């Protein structure tokens, strides 16, 4: 009886899971060639995938959840997916270069999603890009609500001006990363001090910063640099994104599970420098910490001890290491100043030698990871080609040996023919002089094979 109840419960759970998958998939449309003509009437969030792509298969359940969530909240954005290998011409038209590629299509515009492949991040991207490019903030209450909701956002304060046109141009390019708002001077919080109008501000890290055209240069470049919080928990994706800012990244490489003084101290030092020395270093440095050294080891092609501090130049793969432990904030500030004045020598880079080293390192890492994860698969992948090459080499060697033997047989046969001709000539000369006497026959030389038989 107990077994029957367990079996019934198991079947019920399986049925629920299957139904849930069917329901989720029902809100994601499979797109075909007709999508090109019909898409302009709606806003579409599309996953361009390939059936054989492993990352695409990992994204599929998340994508189904995105479709279900967007439908449940009544979003005007439709969610779909397209096999980019079957409809390659359409995928090429939208600029698909790899798989999976997520794009939001709004009218004639196509926006690439480059963030983490999580449900919440994808949905936030869809809401941000599908809405107005510049969102108005009509009241202080709305302003405060946006401050609580977004960790980083930009605000234009003022009326029509050339600065506003630049702001709109920057927003059209960078809306895929952050939010852009506009407000009147009366709506801005009282603690904000503006020396001149119009102005562009960024609100983050529980404070604000004002754009200065003379000090900060191009507005789009400034927004691209300031769209990150001053201190971040880093991962590989964030480091890749920071490569566009031109900033150096000061990292405390720690083990977050380790609560010893060495690990917590380095993290606190970096946080304090990021907070207290922002005016000195924020134009050139981004601060943060990373849990574990696996990614950093791959990036540096070296084994870093944990905990440690490393400064990365993600634009050219250079890095800076200190030959001693950083014990306090003063040590870290001195390290940064030495990097800025060129006292500390950069390591790594993207030279030809480093690129060759990278190829060898990546190949070695791939082989090691395969053997660690699946030794049998590694033996098959690398043993089979080696076996084929060995057989080919053996075949070439034996073919040369047989050729030599055939050549030797040819030389032996040639000499036998010459001997036979000489014997026949001697017979003809002896027959007239002997007058019919019997001449003993000369035994012909034996073939090489006959000699072997004897």
UniProtKB/Swiss-Prot annotation:
Alphabetized CDD domains for the sequence: PDI_a_TMX3
Protein's UniProt keywords contain Heme: no
Lumenal side of membrane: 25-375
GO MF terms, alphabetically ordered: protein disulfide isomerase activity; protein-disulfide reductase activity
Location in the cell: Endoplasmic reticulum membrane
Main EC class the enzyme belongs to: isomerase
Signal peptide: 1-24
Biased composition (Basic and acidic residues): 444-454
UniProt KW keywords: Disulfide bond, Endoplasmic reticulum, Glycoprotein, Isomerase, Membrane, Redox-active center, Signal, Transmembrane, Transmembrane helix
Keyword Signal: yes
Domain of life, source organism: Eukaryota
Induction details: Not up-regulated by unfolded protein response (UPR).
Tissue: Widely expressed. Expressed in brain, testis, lung, skin, kidney, uterus, bone, stomach, liver, prostate, placenta, eye and muscle.
Residue ranges annotated as Cytoplasmic topological domain: 397-454
Membrane topology, from the record: Single-pass membrane protein
Entry's free-text remark on domains: The di-lysine motif confers endoplasmic reticulum localization for type I membrane proteins.
Family membership noted in the UniProt record: Belongs to the protein disulfide isomerase family.
Function: Probable disulfide isomerase, which participates in the folding of proteins containing disulfide bonds. May act as a dithiol oxidase. Acts as a regulator of endoplasmic reticulum-mitochondria contact sites via its ability to regulate redox signals.
Protein name: Protein disulfide-isomerase TMX3
Taxonomic lineage: Eukaryota, Metazoa, Chordata, Craniata, Vertebrata
